Amino acid sequence: MRYLVLPVILLVLTGCKALTTFDKYATMRLYEVYEAENLSACDYKPQFRDCTVDKRSFNVRITDDKSKIALVVGKRYAYFGFTRDDFARQTQPLRDFLIWAEDPNAQDKQIKQLRKAGNVGGSLFYNTEVEYQFDYLHTRADVPLLVVKPHENANSYGLTVEEVKNLLSVMDAWYAGTFSGKQLT
């Protein structure tokens, strides 16, 4: 009887892996969701020129072919993200914000950028273009804030300097192939 314990455990584990693989393809899920530490943003409220108190924590969704990455809440809805084929251009507003934030006399600034919609509205696979809007501004408390609006009908998300640095750290690791977050799906 004791000789059957190990084979039974291995059989159960193999079955779990097969069930997970079956679920992935049966639901046509062509991505995986990973936990990423310290990725957050606030809901920006333009009428108050500030963020809400609550922070929204993000995980990342990465396509199976590693061509796209998006910030997601939990395992579901994609908020905004990046594509490998246009990574340098798409991350430039984030890098420029960090330079802008170092100048205490910097004036508010707005940048608009056409990008693939594949990271907006919950899907990674739409390839129509939408206009992302990046606002560099100071809050009422004079804190530099990057406000990202990934679509004209989307909410705006505010990121502090530290949050932008954390976001770039994760995005750069993904682009370099060294991202190692815990897999959630």
Task: Please tell me what each predicted stretch does.
Residues 1-18:
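Sec-dependent bacterial lipoprotein signal peptides
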